[in-house]
A protein has these predicted regions:
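Compact, glycine-rich, soluble single-domain proteins
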Residues: 1-118
């Protein structure tokens, strides 16, 4: 489990609480394939890497999806309802998934940088 903070022009802005946002990292093929399928929600976010597109087939809840480039800068943020296929983002190398509405509260928007720490 890692912790995420949002950085804007070199200044760190903490996410949820003083410790940032808890992030699960899905880097293996099996973990990337499973993603958030079968869950009723998530506390924090899930980072899928490498990844540049997602779907919400068989999902039980709507999610926010942030596409990150190789430097962890946000390329795009979208909200997806269950049963949708997201567009491929060629510049994206990583994807963050969270419950719908969470990313706006964390300050995630195109152009900001995400920092992960153990």
């Amino acid at each position: 489990m890692a912790t995420m903070t949002v950085q804007e022009q070199g200044d760190a802005q903490e996410g949820v609480g003083a410790g940032g946002v808890p992030v699960e990292v899905a880097a293996s093929y099996r973990a990337r394939t499973r993603g958030l399928l079968g869950r009723d929600g998530i506390d924090g976010a899930l980072m899928i890497t490498p990844c540049n597109s997602v779907h919400t087939f068989r999902m039980r809840f709507a999610i926010d999806v942030a596409y990150l480039d190789k430097e962890f800068r946000v390329v795009d943020v979208v909200t997806m309802k269950p049963g949708r296929l997201g567009m491929i983002r060629p510049r994206a190398r990583h994807v963050l998934e969270a419950e719908a509405g969470a990313m706006a509260g964390w300050g995630l928007r195109p152009g900001v940088r995400v920092a992960l720490r153990p």
